[in-house]
Amino acid sequence: HECSSAASDVYKRQDAAHTPLTIKKDNGLIISIHEANLINYSSMTLAPKGNGLLEVELYPWSDGTKVKLDNKITSPWRFIQIADNSSKLLDSDIILNLNEDPDENQDFSWVKPGKYMGVWWEMIGTNESTWWQSQNHGANNSKVKYYLDFASKNNFNGLLVEGWNKGWHPEWCCSGNGDPFSFTESVNDFDINYLSSYGNSIGVNLVGHHETGGQIQNYENQLEDAFKLYNRIGVKNIKTGYVNDVSKNIKKINPEGTVSREWHHGQYMIDHFQKVIETAAKYKLNIIKHEPIKDTGLRRKYPNFISREGAKGQEFNGFSSNGVNHATDLPFTRLLSGPMDYTPGIFQLNNFRYVSPGSDEIDKNAIVPSTIAKELALYVVYYSPMQMAADLPKHYIKHPEAFEFIKSVPVEWSKKNVIDSKISEFV
């Protein structure tokens, strides 16, 4: 989130802020502080020290070391943007300018933008299906085939399917116990070879899904085989997840067999994410990362780092609420760093969530704090080269004109023009 997790055990929530941190001064100046080209280092937060001072805090290793390096220290760039109004803050390429071009021997011409739908909102949003196998399992052959047909008919080129693989169970979230996940074996009511082949034949590639549960060693042990599988069956994009409700709960298995718990935004995870994106490039796969580290512009060198979450996205409106002003905060905080997989496009804004999977009872308290017009505006304001239409087909069918906008709006733009804006109010 744009101002959330603490940087050490002694901090309480919001005693330190992730970057980009945006500040509006009394004289009207808007200041944003961030970092770029974060590789083989630890992520910084900014902690208030009184008298208007902010101090950089690095997420340490479990032994207290801030950064572990072999030969030389190469820190990320730290930079400050200053503008006399909020609109000018949005018109900057500094984060990309502080990163490097791809290596000369790397060809990323295979990276393509697109739009995708997903078997996902009916689990986390409408609560009518489950990730795990049950009579209401979402990732079953007949349902996925229906989604593929609907996506193809409406010119989407991707379909995310969550809950396709072995390891899901009702208590999977969110303790950090992700050890059982397999990233190569599908459950018995999901035929990955048939569905990927069928989707490819009608112009809709499966969007792969790797929820790790924050168990890094389990994922890295399977990384090569998992990416080989996706490359073989024609997957182009993978959404990865690291759901873990405790920030310092990433299990690291040390060479001697002991276990340490590392910070989600520390160097251990920075190195892991780097390994994932480089391995994905080898197999011509794009990564859409959820529960990521912050975007620091690495997409310039690795264009297959196509999008990421990194703030409270639409999913929180499924089981909680982002509030009405959250959407107009993000362009001036999280989105300053790069593309965001917010997953917009929810049209059924109330009477959408069932009390439990298989139930006919509606949770009357569940409301998405939005309007259809606002959901459409997100496709213009929230940049993501791989953009999602997150709602269910049955909800889009009710609103054909609005759905037509989602189908036709670009995901890549040749020019950006910020007409006017005011933080937390409009853009």
Residue ranges and their predicted role:
Residues 391-427:
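Glycan-recognition and catalytic regions of carbohydrate-active enzymes
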Residues 163-362:
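Aromatic- and carboxylate-enriched substrate-binding clefts and catalytic-loop regions
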Residues 1-7, 11:
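Single conserved hydrophobic/aromatic residue that forms the stacking wall/gate
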Residues 355-376, 380-382, 387:
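Long hydrophobic segments that form regular secondary structure
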Residues 9-210:
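Conserved structural scaffold segments of CAZyme catalytic domains across common CAZy folds
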Residues 151, 287, 381:
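Conserved, mostly hydrophobic/aromatic
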Residues 6, 155, 233-234:
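Short loop/turn motifs at secondary-structure junctions
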